Amino acid sequence: MFALFFDYATTTNDLDATTLKSFAIIIPCVALIVMYVLFGWFWSIAIGLQTKVPNTVKMKVKKFKVFFFIPFIYILSLLVFMALFGLSDFEAEPDLNSAFPFGLLTIMLPLHFLSIFGIFYSLYFVAKTYKTVELQREVSFSDFAGEFFMIWFYFIGVWIIQPKINEMVEDTPMEAQYV
């Protein structure tokens, strides 16, 4: 997404304010679509498979929901801020002596790290839920480390994990579907 903007910006000599403003709308909108799909997939696995978790295993669903919505709200507000900032007529040479950049950094940096932690906890919880349902027992990180990385690199992992999730939900073995 950003590569498209960079490619356009470097190959075009007539990059005007209207083009920049249109990219200020397009890039956050595309990022929102990707975010909704990815976070929706996380939510559907983590919450949707809770009915298949054995009664002997206690999953911390409330903790997941808190850490799920922290990055969700942070990314959403960041994209809205970027779109509004991109639409405004900001100065070409901002005053770096003002308190705004420092104040923004002191607010954004801790929120960014909290958001990163929330995303990793969501990945952890989704992978743990998936493996708990698959094995029908309490699992440790070593049991679901592979699933954790497949969910993290979702563009590859979705092709491996999603068919198994579909099988878990349907309660029919995958081999039986092709006989």
Predicted regions span which residues?
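Membrane-helix interface segments in multi-pass membrane proteins
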Residues: 2-35, 75-117
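Low-complexity, intrinsically disordered extramembrane tails and loops of integral membrane proteins
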Residues: 13-18, 167-179
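Membrane-water interface of transmembrane alpha-helices
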Residues: 36-51, 122-128, 161-162
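Alpha-helical transmembrane segments with an aromatic anchor "belt"
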Residues: 45-75
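Cytoplasmic membrane-interface regions of multi-pass membrane proteins
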Residues: 45-57, 127-136, 167-173
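Feature detects long, helix-prone N-terminal segments enriched in hydrophobes
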Residues: 75-79, 104-148, 161
